[in-house]
């Protein structure tokens, strides 16, 4: 058994105010567990995405999460959960007025991610990759169609 206070786990660079990788801190090898805190207007992921071989579950602790899906928007309030099958496209946002706290669980833990973001140069959503910004403690999203930067996160 291993126990860890969430506040003791370092937050990683993310579109969310806080993303704390609990699985690593707990030594969990067969499931990814991330703790998130999102201010109004923030999102869980770097873009609309899917994991071809991973199912993903979000449990909302406080606030309300809105998930953009292929079937339209779905809201999940505090003490509610949502599951995405492997290959389902989704992106969760905090469209409310209060802070959103949630846990995200994924299995298997190591999974490829297919990611799209809006590209101003190409127009519309385009396949995207994530890179570390040169000389900065930041991540950038790059359009794979034109090479343009579509987002910067620190």
Report the location of each language-model feature.
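Short functional micro-motifs and their immediate structural scaffolds
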Residues: 124-129, 151
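Short linker/helix segments within small regulatory modules
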Residues: 130-140
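Short, cysteine/histidine-rich loop/knuckle motifs that typically chelate Zn2+
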Residues: 120-123, 144-145
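A short, N-terminal "cap"/entry segment at the start of jelly-roll beta-barrel domains
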Residues: 1-32, 140-154
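Short, conserved beta-strand element in jelly-roll/cupin
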Residues: 36-38, 50-68
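A short beta-loop-beta micro-motif enriched in histidine and acidic residues
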Residues: 28-31, 43-56
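Ligand-binding loop in jelly-roll beta-barrel domains
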Residues: 86-117
């Amino acid at each position: 058994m291993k126990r860890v206070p969430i506040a003791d786990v370092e937050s990683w660079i993310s579109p969310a105010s806080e993303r704390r990788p609990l699985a690593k801190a707990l030594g969990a090898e067969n499931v990814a567990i991330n703790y998130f805190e999102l201010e109004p207007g923030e999102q869980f992921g770097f873009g609309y995405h899917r994991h071809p071989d991973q199912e993903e579950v979000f449990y909302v602790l406080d606030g309300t999460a809105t998930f953009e899906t292929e079937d339209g928007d779905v809201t999940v309030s505090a003490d509610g959960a949502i599951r995405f099958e492997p290959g389902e496209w989704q992106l969760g946002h905090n469209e409310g007025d209060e802070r959103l706290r949630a846990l995200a669980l994924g299995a298997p833990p190591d999974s490829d991610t297919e990611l799209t973001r809006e590209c101003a140069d190409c127009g519309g959503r385009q396949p995207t990759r994530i890179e570390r910004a040169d000389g900065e403690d930041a991540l950038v999203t790059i359009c794979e169609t034109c090479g343009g930067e579509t987002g910067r996160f620190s």
